Each structure stands twice: as structure tokens, then as C-alpha cells.
Amino acid sequence: MSGPEIPNLLSSLRSARGGRGRGRGRGGHASSSATHDSTIQGTDTDASVSRLSAVDLGYLDDPYAQYFVRSSAGPAARRLPIINRGTYARTISLDTLIESFLSADQSTGPDSTPKQIVSLGAGTDTRPFRLFASKARPGLVYHELDFEVVTSKKLRTVQAVPLLRNILTNVTQLTEHSWSSKPSGGEYYCHGQDLRNFSLSKASKEYHNTQDAPQEKPEITLPGLRTDIPTLLLSECCLCYLNGTEASDVLNFFTSRIPNLATIIYEPIRPDDAFGKMMVSNLAARRIEMPTLKMYPTPEDQRTRLRTAGFETVHHMTIEDIWQNWVSPEEKQRVDYLEGLDEVEEWKLLAAHYIVVWASRGSGFGNWGGVGVGA
């Protein structure tokens, strides 16, 4: 399904003290569907505030974050140092992989290879603004999927803010649930699509003309989706909130259509040790489940998951690994100088309970799969 931000394990540990991080909500039916969806959608504000906190303190450079935080609530909250560092580490890890994907096997000029990114449960993510504004992106096709209420709100924000409107120009309403733009020679699409519908649509076909057939669902259509170019499927704390079948059906939708496909999955892991149990308990107190966390609790489980889905080359690193290996000593010093971090051991525990798994199959990815490996 799609949806805005859901509190991740980093944030839930500190929710009692006001610290929340960014996650991608979308599933699990711990309560009634409407109530659960509302809970997920409400956490988008927490995530955008966490992002803005990291920006305001100098961790990240993101001039667009401010426009997705309600100013009527007063000054944006300042998150705890450990939350700000988590937001920073997660962002730079994904940015590094995405930029590497975009530059892999890439020439300059009119012969450059088109690339496509599909972001699941994008919420208030500012990445498309940052990508299209940083330099010309001819041939980049960028899709975001989320609950319709979220994508509609994003459209209103774009239309209301000149800086955003100047990036996502020529906005067009394609269908009742999808809108698009033509930024910097590229293409942007935003789809109001509950990711759980991928399973419902599949079930409609499988049980067609039987007494057990579920209520008929329309065919899943994503206007502008290309199947002929290298594509990156991004799940930033998204699929972990779907049940196992739903998550697999989302992956299958894309693997069955796009031969040259890569994915990045950012999710929590290790729910069975003492620290993991505490984090899961804190999430459960907020009536939030992470079904795939139970199904893929270890790094190897996550790797096997993607191999089973059809990906040929699979890599992983924990956030702790990425902090140690991808962040230069000079950058670590800069980040430390911003606030300092007293809870070093707690940070290591938190960072060890998040993983980034990236995988690819087919052509058009160059050495993308080996980014940072062995660094």
C-alpha cells in the first residue's frame, strides 16, 4: 500500500521524550483499516519534523523540508541528537546509492541512458525536489506512490509554494489518482495508490469466476511507468509494514514487468534480541506492527528475500556499517561538532538494528551493486 511516514524504531525508543524519526508507513492490520491508516498518515508530520530538525541543525542540506512542516504549530521541534544522527545516516546512505544508480553506465549528452526511480510510500519525501533541482536530469523518470490523501496534499503544497512549483513545472492531472510534471527535461509522476491493492488486484484475477472471489478491484495502472529502462525500486521503511504476501506482491508487480531492475530496501532487523524486543514493544504500544520484520529478522534473511524475488546481485550494510565506512573522518568530525553525542553505545545499538539492502538484475547498473562494499 502506500502511505506517509510511520514512526521507525529509532523514533519509538524516544517517543516518550519527544523524539521521532522517519519511516514509511503502509500496512499491517493491527486495528481497523481506517483507524490504522489514519495512525500511519498522522505520523507523516513527525517524520517531516525530524527531517527539518536535522536540516536546521546543519546535518543535511535540504531547502525544501520546511515546506512540509506546518508552521501553525509554532517553531519546529528540535529532535534529540541520536534521532538527528539517525536521520542523517539514513539519508546519506540512500542518497549515495541513488546517485550511484543514476550515474552508472551513464554517458553525457543526448545519448545518456534514461533511468527510472519508483519510490514506495513516499510521503513528504523531498528527494525528487533535490534531484531535479541539483542539475538537469534528462531522461530521469521519477514515480512516487502513496495514499491518495497524501499525494493530493503534496500536490497542493507544490502548487502553493513557488520554489517547489518552479521545480515541478507544468503539473497535469492525469487521472483521478495520478498527477505529473515535466521537471528539467525529466518526468515526475505521483500516484495515489494503496500498496495493499497490488495483492487485491492479483487475488481478483486468481479467483475470477469462483464463489470465493474477492470484491472485484480495478487493474493496477501507474501512468508513465516504463518497463524498458533501468529502474530503481525504493522502499524506505515501507514494505516492512505490509504483511508478507502483500510485500511480495508489490515486488512481484515490478519484477514481472521490468527486466532491468534494482531495489533498495531500508528496514529494521534483529527483533529477537533484547534491544529489538524493546523497540518492537514500543511500536506495538502505538498499535503498529511490522510483519516482515518477523519474516526477515537477519541480514541473510533479507538477502535471501531478494534473491527469491529474482534479483541476481545482492548487498547489504547496517546503518552502523555505513556510518563507519561511508562517512569520512572529516564528515564524522563535522557531524559530531554540530551537537555531540553522549549516547554513543545506544547509537551503535540503534544503528545495528537497521539495514540497507540493495540488489539488481539485468543491465544498466554498472558497478552500482558494489558501492561501498569493502570500503
UniProtKB/Swiss-Prot annotation:
Keywords, sorted A to Z: Methyltransferase, S-adenosyl-L-methionine, Transferase
Entry superkingdom: Eukaryota
Region Disordered, annotated ranges: 1-45
GO molecular function: protein C-terminal leucine carboxyl O-methyltransferase activity
EC code(s) of this entry: 2.1.1.233
Amino acid composition bias (Polar residues), ranges on this chain: 35-45
Gene Ontology annotations of biological process type: methylation
Binding site for S-adenosyl-L-methionine: R90, G121, D146, D194, L195, E236
SUPFAM superfamilies the UniProt entry points to: S-adenosyl-L-methionine-dependent methyltransferases (SSF53335)
Biased composition, class Basic residues, residue ranges: 17-27
Functional note: Methylates the carboxyl group of the C-terminal leucine residue of protein phosphatase 2A catalytic subunits to form alpha-leucine ester residues.
Recorded family membership: Belongs to the methyltransferase superfamily. LCMT family.
Protein name as it appears in the record: Leucine carboxyl methyltransferase 1
